[in-house]
Amino acid sequence: MQGFKQHTGLVVPLDAANVDTDAIIPKQFLQKVSRLGFGKHLFHDWRFLDDAGEQPNPEFVMNHARYQGASILLARENFGCGSSREHAPWALADYGIRAMIAPSFADIFYGNSINNQMVPVRLTEQEVDELFQYVQATEGAQIEVDLEALKVRANGKEYSFEIDDFRRHCLLNGLDHIGLTLQHEDKIAAFEADIPAFLR
């Protein structure tokens, strides 16, 4: 997997709190276990006026022309609450989101996002308010998320955020659970070689 060090991207402001995983990816689309193909269903019930997903909702922020191609999602508190479905971060990643900024995230969603190489950045409510004001007032507004320096930069300002060292290491080096395991492939092979034949 590709590591995440710094990313500068267009920002889409989703001005809503307590956005749950059923809103992020509705249950009718949870019919496969591949990570790919969920982006087209992201926020389906908000993005579209019909069940088939053919009539975009012109009122929904992600359908506005100025936010097309956004790779950073700005949201309010408790983003990703609700069920623990990993399809929610799959849909965001498949859509093209690389980082999310909010005052808080649901715990399981937070971990699942990191496992899918997206950076969930927690800033204070005041800092998030400042970013909303900047993004909503500035067409083409971009934000830089610097995981190496643990900084967010926007509109000439710099904001600090925290992430635990282990998760930061995994993101910087593009490691998921399988990748972490494969780092010890030689030790695993040596252990298996020592297993008595009658136990194999």
UniProtKB/Swiss-Prot annotation:
GO CC terms for this protein?
3-isopropylmalate dehydratase complex
Which SUPFAM superfamilies does the UniProt record give? LeuD/IlvD-like
Q: Which UniProt keywords apply?
A: Amino-acid biosynthesis, Branched-chain amino acid biosynthesis, Leucine biosynthesis, Lyase
CDD domains to which the protein is assigned, alphabetical? IPMI_Swivel
Q: Which domain of life is it from?
A: Bacteria
Instruction: Quote the subunit structure annotation.
Output: Heterodimer of LeuC and LeuD.
Provide the top EC class: lyase
What Gene Ontology molecular function terms does this protein carry?
3-isopropylmalate dehydratase activity
Q: Which reaction(s) does its UniProt entry say it catalyses?
A: (2R,3S)-3-isopropylmalate = (2S)-2-isopropylmalate
Question: What is the protein's given name?
Answer: 3-isopropylmalate dehydratase small subunit
**Gene Ontology biological process:** L-leucine biosynthetic process
| NCBIfam families per UniProt | leuD (TIGR00171), PRK01641.1 (NF002458)
- Per the UniProt record, the source organism is Vibrio vulnificus (strain YJ016)
The UniProt gene name for this protein comes to leuD
